[in-house]
A protein has these predicted regions:
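Glycine-rich phosphate-binding loops of nucleotide-dependent enzymes
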Residues: 1-179
Length: 179
């Protein structure tokens, strides 16, 4: 809970003029604090961590810590959420939970700029994908176009007559940017 409240410090920090009023619970600080706590609890509920609201963040499993980081960012009400490798180190179950969370964030109207090697996550949440190979643009398009793009397949899966490329995304490690 404290991690999500810290993210809202701008709305909670009374300015010098209203500082004295805040000490006495006047001037709207109590209301701002209630709103911040409600927002934090809403995000803890959305990431299935409300029951652990008082636990130290460092005591959470790694996947939960990643979702908590995203919830902390969302407590600032961004219009664009920029994420760099949020699925790094996650197991498949945690990656699925992350992708689901990102889809709900998109549904709420927040755009996402994602840099990610987990192409399963990229394909599930992206409208448009830019694929880079060693910093060079090799493809741009929607997920279906990227999945079928020969340059993407060659760069990230290799080319071989023996390769089964029916599902190229399952085993690729491409760097993608999705928004």
């Amino acid at each position: 809970l404290e991690n999500l409240l810290v993210a809202q410090h701008n709305t909670l920090m009374p300015n010098v003029a209203s500082g004295l009023l805040a000490v006495f619970g006047l001037g709207g600080h109590a209301r701002a604090q209630t709103v911040a706590i409600d927002r934090a609890c809403e995000w803890l509920d959305r990431i299935n961590l409300l029951a652990r609201a008082d636990d130290p963040a460092g005591a959470l499993p790694y996947g939960d810590q990643r979702r908590l980081e995203i919830a902390r960012a969302m407590c600032t009400s961004p219009v664009l959420l920029c994420l760099d490798e949020p699925a790094a180190g996650l197991n498949p179950r945690e990656s699925d939970a992350l992708a689901s969370l990102l889809k709900t964030i998109q549904a709420d109207g927040c755009s996402i700029l994602l840099i990610e090697h987990d192409m399963g996550v990229v394909m599930r949440i992206s409208d448009q994908i830019v694929v880079l190979d060693h910093g060079k643009l090799i493809a741009h398009g929607d997920p279906a176009a990227i999945r079928a793009n020969p340059a993407v397949i060659a760069a990230y899966l290799g080319e071989s007559d023996d390769d089964d490329i029916d599902s190229p995304i399952a085993s690729t490690s491409a760097t993608g940017v999705a928004a």
